[in-house]
A protein has these predicted regions:
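A basic/glycine-biased coupling hinge at the interface between accessory DNA-binding modules
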Residues: 1-93, 102, 110, 139
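Core RecA-like ATPase module of SF1/SF2 helicases and allied nucleic-acid translocases
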Residues: 245, 252, 256-310
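SF2 helicase catalytic motif II
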Residues: 108-125, 142
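Phosphate/oxyanion-binding active-site loops and adjacent basic polyanion-contact surfaces
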Residues: 7, 83, 87-90, 185, ...
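Alpha-helical scaffold elements adjacent to nucleotide-binding pockets in ATP/GTP-utilizing enzyme cores
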Residues: 1, 6, 10-14, 130-133, ...
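Short, polar/flexible loop-turn hinges at active-site or ligand-entry regions and domain interfaces
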Residues: 1-3, 15-31, 54-60, 78-83, ...
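Conserved RecA-like helicase ATPase core segment
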Residues: 125-234
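Short basic/glycine-enriched coil/helix segment immediately N-terminal to the Walker B
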Residues: 98-115, 136-137
Length: 310
């Protein structure tokens, strides 16, 4: 069974087979083998989880789509030769096992009366197909999710599953129960969230949320009793020096006030810890005597002491 790294490494080892595919260069221009392997994995995972078969693509008149079909076919042949499976192929095999074997499907359905799925906004197409396949005609399915927290699109998840869920049932069959009380977050965070969703909707951002979320306003479980604000704005313009300085001052204020007993109580969340903006902030903090732990940032070999040792 291949995890994400194993999968990419397997493609990397066989990159010559993919590069020999006709019109390969249309889909993946010249580049490093590792990057091409990563792109191939993304393509085959997304196609597989949408239940797309290679033959469907290979017969297309569009050369790039036909090339994608050949890439998917080659990838599956490599899996078969090595008797290997990845996460997407597990889902595919499960789907076909149930779809093509009525006895097995009926036996499973006889043991399942209700299906409950949490974090439904993070499910993909094939997972929804499996859920409805197992539920059968009864469709006793309960799903819980938040369309504003659809974070796993990069792994094939689609927000359409939760937005269009009621449409999978006849009129009156699907009951929607809004869960608008937030028991986890400080009321200041909840208020900021509501203001943010309102502010980003409309002409200013050239975007309308109405097609991508259920209309709602979240309420905090209780009003915050903290004297300190839960949400702080540290930069108003795209000025790196101002951003660095404000963050440093904010951390120092937390430490001096006793709200921090150790700098390791501070965590930063970024899309990528390797982004130049992020590594620049880390270097700035370390220059100001605040150590940063970020093992995936590739900063290790940039440290003076490591360069001297090498």
């Amino acid at each position: 069974l291949l995890d994400a790294f194993d999968q990419q490494y397997m493609v990397f080892q066989n990159i010559h087979r993919f590069r020999n595919i006709s019109k390969f260069e249309i889909v993946l221009p010249n580049g490093g083998a590792w990057k091409q392997a990563e792109a191939i994995c993304n393509y085959v995972n997304n196609l597989s989880e949408e239940l797309v078969e290679p033959e469907e693509l290979m017969s297309d008149f569009d050369l790039s789509i036909a090339a994608l079909g050949r890439i998917l076919k080659e990838y599956r042949e490599i899996l078969a030769e090595g008797n290997l499976m990845d996460f997407s192929s597990i889902q595919i095999e499960t789907y076909h096992l149930l779809q093509d074997n009525a006895v097995i499907l009926d036996e499973l359905r006889s043991k399942i009366t209700h299906i409950m799925v949490d974090e439904y906004q993070d499910t993909n197409f094939i997972q929804e197909q499996l859920i409805f396949l197992l539920a059968g005609e009864n469709k006793n399915i309960c799903v819980v999710g938040d369309d504003d927290q659809g974070l796993y699109r990069f792994r094939g998840a689609t927000i359409r599953n939760i937005l269009e869920f009621p449409q999978k049932f006849a009129n009156g069959e699907c009951r929607i129960i809004p869960l608008v009380i937030n028991y986890r977050s400080n009321s200041g965070i909840v208020d900021f969230y509501n203001r943010w969703m309102d502010a980003t909707d409309g002409a200013k951002f050239k975007f309308r949320w109405e097609n991508f979320r259920y209309e709602k306003s979240i309420e905090p479980h209780e009003k915050s009793t903290l004297r300190s604000p839960a949400v702080v704005k540290l930069a108003g313009v795209d000025d790196v020096d101002e951003w660095h300085g404000n963050i440093l001052r904010f951390i120092h204020e937390l430490k001096v006030s006793g709200k921090l007993t150790d700098y390791n109580q501070v965590a930063f969340l970024f899309n990528s810890v390797k982004h130049p903006r992020v590594t620049a902030l880390a270097r700035f903090l370390e220059e100001n005597h605040i150590n940063v732990y970020s093992p995936r940032s590739d900063m290790f070999f940039q440290r003076d002491e490591i360069r001297l040792a090498l």
